Amino acid sequence: MPRVKRGVTAKARHKKILDQAKGYYGARSRTYRVAKQAVIKAGQYAYRDRRQKKRQFRALWITRINAQARECGLSYSRLIDGLKKASIELDRKILADMAVHDKVAFAAIAEQAKAALAG
């Protein structure tokens, strides 16, 4: 059986990692061993943060909805309860967008929620 020299595959593997680490600071973009660790860690952060992004945006939307709801005389939880009772199915992303860009429409929806809570 002939001897297999790994020069070509090793070079390709190193090049792949160093290409992924392009733009990293210092040895992280130049040294294979350090670059490999940096790329692995970056992948872990990316995986974790793709999940956290969803939580963070939902929290941001709730904060924005709450701020606008309080200007309309309701708390966030009372607003959501009122919307459910009024059978208004708007998700938090849309409500938050309305709270920022269309305060008049948000106020009208808040009034409907208030009416549903009262009646």
Swiss-Prot record:
GO terms for molecular function: rRNA binding; structural constituent of ribosome. Binds directly to 23S ribosomal RNA and is necessary for the in vitro assembly process of the 50S ribosomal subunit. It is not involved in the protein synthesizing functions of that subunit. The keyword RNA-binding applies. It comes from Legionella pneumophila subsp. pneumophila (strain Philadelphia 1 / ATCC 33152 / DSM 7513). This is Large ribosomal subunit protein bL20. Keywords: Ribonucleoprotein, Ribosomal protein, RNA-binding, rRNA-binding. CDD domains: Ribosomal_L20 (cd07026). HAMAP family: Ribosomal_bL20. It comes from the Bacteria. One of its GO terms (cellular component) is ribonucleoprotein complex. Belongs to the bacterial ribosomal protein bL20 family. Transmembrane segments: none annotated. InterPro entries: Ribosomal_bL20, RIBOSOMAL_L20_CS, Ribosomal_protein_bL20_C. GO terms for biological process: ribosomal large subunit assembly; translation. PANTHER family: 39S RIBOSOMAL PROTEIN L20.
